[in-house]
């Protein structure tokens, strides 16, 4: 099923969509309206299906979008929201990366790909690949992983990464 809800944050609309069965299978969002959200939903659906996670597009009301929003605004700690994630279709390595990132890199801070890789005894490229395939943005805070030389990329838009970090009060990485 999918649950979609619109919220407001820092004077902007944010649309949050969550695929779920018993737990969250995937999250996507848009700061650019409902039409762009539909593009993001299709991208997430394709990612989940490539990972053999069955996706049902039937809309059903759920508390999950509000939970994601509460993580976004800091009312729920990221690590406390891990229990809502199914981790279906996620590799054991990706799950480890997501859990370490979520538990170790707190709201208001960032970590470089290299630093996170060192914590996990792996390569920065492997960490980057896991971040790119993260089906749980906002809850698993891949936006907090930055390049040594600057902000770095973010799917769907670099501007979204900057906005998420600004919401969290991160200074110096958002300009």
UniProtKB/Swiss-Prot annotation:
This enzyme catalyzes only one turnover and therefore is not strictly catalytic. According to one definition, an enzyme is a biocatalyst that acts repeatedly and over many reaction cycles. Gene3D superfamilies: Methylated DNA-protein cysteine methyltransferase domain, Winged helix-like DNA-binding domain superfamily/Winged helix DNA-binding domain. The gene is ogt. This is Methylated-DNA--protein-cysteine methyltransferase. InterPro entries: DNA_protcyst_Mta_Thcoc, MethylDNA_cys_MeTrfase_AS, MethylDNA_cys_MeTrfase_DNA-bd, MethylDNA_cys_MeTrfase_DNAb, MGMT, MGMT_N, MGMT_N_sf, WH-like_DNA-bd_sf. It comes from the Archaea. It comes from Thermococcus barophilus (strain DSM 11836 / MP). Its EC number is 2.1.1.63. Its main location: cytoplasm. Keywords: Cytoplasm, DNA damage, DNA repair, Methyltransferase, Transferase. The lineage of its organism: Archaea, Methanobacteriati, Methanobacteriota, Thermococci, Thermococcales.
